[in-house]
Amino acid sequence: MTMISVNEFKNGLTIQYNNDLWRIVEFQHVKPGKGSAFVRSKLKSLRTGAVQEYTFRSTAKVETADIQTKSMQYLYNDGSSYVFMDTSTYDQLAIPNEQIGDEANYLLENMVVSVITHEGETLGIQLPNTVDLKVAKTEPNIKGDTSSGGGKPATMETGLVVNVPFFINEGDVLTINTSDGTYVSRANK
C-alpha cells in the first residue's frame, strides 16, 4: 500500500482511512481567501455502504487500499444471500443480502459483475454503469400527457421503481443508470 497526497484524489479511488476502506465518490479542492487550502470529499465505506463527508488539509497524505476485482456471473438468490460463480474456475461465492443492498435492484440472472475483495475479504460488487431492464408495470399512456413534461413511475422486472417518460409502455426494455437509478434511454434491442 502506498501513501498519496489528497491532491491526487480521483473519483473511484479506494483509500484506507480511520480503520475502514473508502471509495471516493466526489471531491473538491478549496482555496479560501485566507488560510490554507483543503480538500472536501465524500467517501463511501466499502464495508457498510455508508457515505460520509471528510475534509483534509491539502498537505495530508492517505494510504491507498489494494483491492482486487474479479469478474463473476450472478446465478440466483437463495433467500439470505446472492450466489455468484467464477466464470473461469466455476467456484461459487455467496454474498449476504445486506452486503449487496440496493444494488440487488439491478441484478439479473446470468449478469456478469465485478466482485470486490480486499485481503481475502469480500466487500461487495461493482455494477456496470448502466443495465438494461424490462418494464414490468406502468400506467398506460393518456393522449396529451406530453405537454406537462413530467414522467410516470415504472416498476422494472427487478422491482426497481424508475420515473420514465410518458411514451414508455409495459414490456419495453430500458437502459437504467446504476449510480442513481435514473432512466437513460430505451435499449436498442
From Swiss-Prot:
InterPro entries the record matches: Elong-fact-P_C (IPR015365), NA-bd_OB-fold (IPR012340), Rib_uL2_dom2 (IPR014722), Transl_elong_fac_P/YeiP (IPR020599), Transl_elong_KOW-like (IPR013185), Transl_elong_P/YeiP_cen (IPR001059), Transl_elong_P/YeiP_CS (IPR013852), Transl_elongation_fac_P (IPR011768)
Pathway(s) served: Protein biosynthesis; polypeptide chain elongation
Organism in which the protein naturally occurs: Lactobacillus acidophilus (strain ATCC 700396 / NCK56 / N2 / NCFM)
GO biological process: peptide biosynthetic process
Keyword Protein biosynthesis among record annotations: yes
Function: Involved in peptide bond synthesis. Stimulates efficient translation and peptide-bond synthesis on native or reconstituted 70S ribosomes in vitro. Probably functions indirectly by altering the affinity of the ribosome for aminoacyl-tRNA, thus increasing their reactivity as acceptors for peptidyl transferase.
Protein name: Elongation factor P 2
GO cellular component, one term: cytoplasm
Main location: cytoplasm
UniProt-listed SUPFAM superfamilies: Nucleic acid-binding proteins, Translation proteins SH3-like domain
